[in-house]
Structures are given as structure tokens and as C-alpha cells.
């Protein structure tokens, strides 16, 4: 085995072939970091047949003028079951970054630690406890099992829906009642989905602005989304849910005809048997449905007049690779939330994964707090409704490469933090 630099082609071919390959360990992310001006390294291990068997994208940032901080975002991509390979990789990686004036090395591997349900109950161990001892022996310090959302650290908990050997019907059957109803609702209510182009990205951004204001969370800036759409190319999809009013109103009119027919039948049943309580209840129920139907038709016509035949209502931002579809961000128009557009977006992308043979649908980050007063309690409930599971990752590891200078650096940083 040998530790070596990799070409972008070698790196991309390998990472696309591996499980637990994160979107930040892709050629698209490499090209993005180059464009942003970062010092970027593609490294890995090749076996005796010159085949890549491990790969890692590293970025380097200047620290204290003469040193660098090296970071691998969710790397490396490697067979973690091969402990000998893991040892060799990190040992050689430390030697490599030392040659490049590294002060310290930071990694947060895409490696599961344990599995939980959405109530925070542990359901299984991923079998990677050995990794903590291994990294300690190699000189890495674990930063702890942090929870919540951090502006610097990657989120440690993902909500993931397993699609392996499942059909669309299987997915719906496993949803809770609300998710089932809303998914079926958007399928029949004229809600359509198409993908936005780069020029149309402001539509998505306006929804994110609506959502961040109503839910009080900090969103990324425009540049974050535009750059990833540009450099990730077809590895980013931005689905838009919208109402086609011609189809929506047509479907409502057809529904009204059926309801009127059923109502007339119920009225005739009452004429024949006035004492039939069941027929009276049926009449009342059908009348309520008709009233609701009429309100929807009136609303549809009014909105069509105000907004034209197509009304955007929700959009999402997704990363795609052969391992998983990642729901990174999404927003909905507050004024039209009742159309349940976000459910149309989710259903479109779940089916995208199924149709492209991708076995994992990642709803992405949750805080890991699992309490009613957690900042993401509503989001956790939403993701739980799809029958997803929680994966907790091993977390962050830091290795001081130049120990004396790193000790001085951390001491100065603590003093600075206390002052400010």
C-alpha cells in the first residue's frame, strides 16, 4: 500500500463507488473549494495493483501566519471495517500534513456511532466503538459528543429513511397518519413538481427567507446555494412544488360532480326511509364536503386571477450522489402552507431516489436533543412521521501536529475568548 495524491478523476470514481460518501467528499466540492481560493488536497491510498482503496479531500487554512489548519469535511472515504487500513491511512495522513506546515488536523468522519428512534431512545450500536481507541492511539483528541447546531462543527445526528428493497407503496404504508394524508392530498390536489434552473433560484431563496423568519433559524447566504448549484452541477437538484390552477380547478369540479351525485342518492334514501339515521349522517357529511369543495374552487379561481395559472408554493435544495439523496434545506410560502407543498417536494425526491436505485434518503440534521422544547422539535416530528431512523455519528477529532505551537495557540485562543 502507498499513501499518495490522487487526481480528481481517481478521487471521484472511488468516492462514487463507496458507502458513507458525503457530498463534501466529491469532485464537485473539490472544484468549489478551488474556486473559493482554498488550498485543497486530494489524497488517498493505493494498493499494490495501483487501485484506490481510500480517499480524502482536505482543505488548508492559514493559522498564525506560518502554519495551516487542515480539515477533512466528513472524510476520509474508506472501508472502516478494515482497521489495518484505517490505521495506515491516518498515520500516513499525519506525516503528509506535517510536510505542509500543519499546526493541527481536524476530521469528522461520516462514520455511525449508534442508532436511535426519534424519541431519542437508542435502538442499536453501529459497532465502531473501536474507532475512538484507535484515534486516541494515533494522537487524535475526541472533542466530545456535542448536541445541537453549531456554526463550525458538523451536525452529529441525521434522520435517515432506508429505501433498500422498498417500493413507493411501502414508504406510504410506513408513514404516520398525517404524512399519509398530506402525501395523498398533494397527489390529487393539482400540486406539481419541477426542477428550478440557476436563473430561477431566487424563487427557492424567497421561500427560505419566509421559513427562516417564521421559524427563527439562521439560513445560509445566497452565495452558498448558487456556488453549490454551479460546481456540483447535476449533483444538486432544486425541486419546486407549484399549483397548476387549470388542473386543480378541473379536479375540484370533478370531485364536486361526484359529491353532488352521492348527495342526491342520500337524499333519495331519506325520502324512502326518513327514519334512516345513517342516511341523515351521510347527507350531513357529504354537504360538509361539498361546502369545503366550493370554498376550494372559489379560492382557486381567486388565486388564479391574482397569480396566473401557476403558483409556486414550496421548494427544496438537495444533494445527490450514488449513496444517498440529501434533503439539505427547504422552504414554503407562509401564505400557501395549507397546500402542503413541502410534502410534494419530499414525495418527488423520495421517488427520485427509488427510481435511480439510491437506497438512502437523508432528511439530514437534527439537534439530538429530542425534547419538546428543543429548537427543532417540530422538524423532528415531521421527519419521524416518515418512519426514518436517527444515525448518530462519531463526532470530531483533532490531532495537534506541531504540539508546542498548538499548545501556545490554544492558550492564546482561550485568553482571547475570555476577553471578547
Swiss-Prot record:
It comes from the Bacteria. One of its GO terms (molecular function) is nucleotide binding. It catalyses: beta-D-GlcNAc-(1->4)-Mur2Ac(oyl-L-Ala-D-isoglutaminyl-L-Lys-(N(6)-Gly)-D-Ala-D-Ala)-di-trans,octa-cis-undecaprenyl diphosphate + 2 glycyl-tRNA(Gly) = MurNAc-L-Ala-D-isoglutaminyl-L-Lys-(N(6)-tri-Gly)-D-Ala-D-Ala-diphospho-di-trans,octa-cis-undecaprenyl-GlcNAc + 2 tRNA(Gly) + 2 H(+). It is an enzyme of class 2 (transferase). It is found in: Cytoplasm. GO terms for cellular component: cytoplasm. Disulfide bonds: none annotated. InterPro entries: Acyl_CoA_acyltransferase, FEMABX, PG_Glycine_Bridge_Synth, tRNA-bd_arm. Pfam families: FemAB. Keywords: Acyltransferase, Cell shape, Cell wall biogenesis/degradation, Cytoplasm, Peptidoglycan synthesis, Transferase. Its main location: cytoplasm. GO terms for biological process: cell wall organization; peptidoglycan biosynthetic process; regulation of cell shape. Its EC number is 2.3.2.17. Homodimer. Interacts with FemB. PANTHER family: AMINOACYLTRANSFERASE FEMA, LIPID II:GLYCINE GLYCYLTRANSFERASE. Belongs to the FemABX family. This is Aminoacyltransferase FemA. It comes from Staphylococcus aureus.
